[in-house]
Curated annotation (Swiss-Prot):
Pathway note: Glycan biosynthesis; glycogen biosynthesis
Provenance organism: Escherichia coli (strain K12)
Name of the gene: glgA
EC number(s) recorded for this UniProt protein: 2.4.1.21
Catalytic EC class: transferase
SUPFAM superfamilies according to UniProt: UDP-Glycosyltransferase/glycogen phosphorylase
Annotated keywords: Glycogen biosynthesis, Glycosyltransferase, Transferase
Residue numbers binding ADP-alpha-D-glucose: K15
Protein name: Glycogen synthase
Assigned protein family: Belongs to the glycosyltransferase 1 family. Bacterial/plant glycogen synthase subfamily.
Annotated GO biological process: DNA damage response; glycogen biosynthetic process
Length: 477
């Protein structure tokens, strides 16, 4: 079984979000599972530099200009690169300029990505062609459409990592992207009078996956579907929509081997976690005290992530004696709010604006509770890292958060399945109730330790996801 992942980023070469973590780990897990998985990426500068052994496979003149297809390896995974400097050789973000304006030629930059993905199934590399083209998010959404236009030389899977990003472009660009105008149709890639790369993926793929079972259900409902609910309900009825939970890359996220921690530990040596907490308290300017629970946030600061609720609930958390360490960037109003809280409560609130991968490991190793109060969360990796590190996740019941964290209710504690704290409603009162439950559990150290060990024993390895995808691919054949 030969599978080509078509996507726009891959950890650690280039990362703007969780999509990169998935592509950085899933193909390697699939190879270990017996699937010949390769990845197709645009040759953005950081990616091009990282694939040092890239060789020319093919050269083509396309609707988006001249391209060179390269092939190399990274961490044992075969990588195809679309080398088109006029489209991809730009500093900074792959999606927008330094003023945060989307590049005006994004329609061509990402149509080309989909087109090359489909051409791979028609022999663009004469020595390897995929049985399945697996496209990820809107950037690769046209790959299933180009395959459909080509007579479907391969099966296609489209994975929704976040339905909120739709890749919308003016209709006149149909003239530029070499797809039949007949595709510009409500039964096709047209959405609200525009081209939707996301809808192209949803409509033309043989199968759609979402990154958790709950999110796969949620996106058939109007409040989560951004206008796509009709199509997604239809795909659900046809048995062509399912959820496959993301995994954790255990080579990178494991407290036993994590070199970024001051003190490594396992579920049997959890007392060694205390040194990480001490170091984190020092680094964040917090009072060094192992008796108080340290809550943490590692997140983009947006309302989707529910961080406004944390600000609102913060006085209640601090009154009970807790501490907060926050690492993140985003909405300027939220940034200011958290910085003001750090100034108002020195020693209790520590804030670092920005994102540092290394420091996120130190927070995960040192905190007692990781807060993930998202309004919606397709899968979420942060809570999975928390479980792995014995840093109990406090989450809202939505998307992948609902699939991965079990509340410390009395019955869950009795059944030995409790792994964190879960609240229902997207408001500060509901969040504070969950924070209160965390304090109650914290006051019973042996029970807290029991739940930590429970959480750390859970299996969210990529091997589980790789097996699910393999079974899906074989069903499509």
């Amino acid at each position: 079984m030969q599978v080509l992942h078509v996507c726009s980023e891959m950890f650690p070469l280039l990362k703007t979000g969780g999509l990169a973590d998935v592509i950085g780990a899933l193909p390697a897990a699939q190879i270990a599972d017996g699937v010949d998985a390769r990845v197709l990426l645009p040759a953005f500068p950081d990616i091009r530099r990282g694939v040092t052994d890239a060789q020319v496979v093919s050269r083509r003149d396309t609707f988006a200009g001249h391209i060179t297809l390269l092939f190399g390896h990274y961490n044992g995974v075969g990588i195809y690169l679309i080398d088109a400097p006029h489209l991809y050789d730009r500093p900074g973000s792959p999606y927008h300029d330094t003023n945060l304006f989307a590049y005006t030629d994004n329609v061509l930059r990402f149509a080309l990505l989909g087109w090359v993905g489909a051409e791979m199934a028609s022999g663009l590399d004469p020595f390897w062609r995929p049985d399945v083209v697996h496209a990820h998010d809107w950037h690769a959404g046209l790959a299933p459409a180009y395959l459909a236009a080509r007579g479907r030389p391969a099966k296609s899977v489209f994975t929704v990592h976040n339905l909120a990003y739709q890749g919308m472009f003016y209709a006149h660009h149909m003239n530029d992207i070499q797809l039949p105008w007949s595709f510009f149709n409500i039964h096709g890639l047209e959405f609200n009078g525009q081209i939707s790369f996301l809808k192209a993926g949803l409509y033309y793929a043989d199968h759609i996956t979402a990154v958790s079972p709950t999110y796969a259900r949620e996106i058939t409902e109007p409040q989560f579907a951004y206008g796509m609910e009709g199509l997604l309900q239809q795909r659900h009825r046809e048995g062509r929509l399912s959820g496959v939970l993301n995994g954790v890359d255990e080579k990178i996220w494991s407290p036993e081997t994590d070199l970024l921690l001051a003190s490594r530990y396992t579920r049997d040596t959890l007392e060694d976690k205390a040194e990480n907490k001490r170091q984190l308290q020092i680094a964040m300017g917090l009072k060094v005290d192992d008796k108080v629970p340290l809550f943490a946030v590692v997140s983009r600061l947006t309302s989707q992530k529910g961080l406004d609720l944390v600000l609102e609930a913060l006085p209640g958390l601090l009154e009970q004696g807790g501490q907060l360490a926050l690492l993140g960037a985003g909405d300027p109003v939220l940034q200011e709010g958290f910085l003001a809280a750090a100034a108002e409560y020195p020693g209790q609130v520590g804030v670092q604006i920005g994102y540092h991968e290394a420091f996120s490991h130190r927070i995960m190793g040192g905190a007692d509770v990781i807060l993930v109060p998202s309004r919606f969360e397709p899968c979420g990796l942060t809570q999975l890292y928390g479980l792995k590190y014995g840093t109990l996740p406090l989450v809202r019941r939505t998307g992948g958060l609902a699939d991965t964290v079990s509340d410390c209710s009395l019955e869950n504690l009795a059944d030995g399945v409790a792994s964190g704290f879960v609240f229902e409603d997207s408001n500060a009162w509901s969040l504070l109730r969950a924070i209160r439950r965390a304090f109650v559990l914290w006051s019973r150290p042996s029970l807290w330790r029991f739940v930590q060990r429970q959480a750390m024993a859970m299996d969210f390895s990529w091997q589980v996801a790789a097996k699910s995808y393999r079974e899906l691919y074989y069903r499509l054949k």
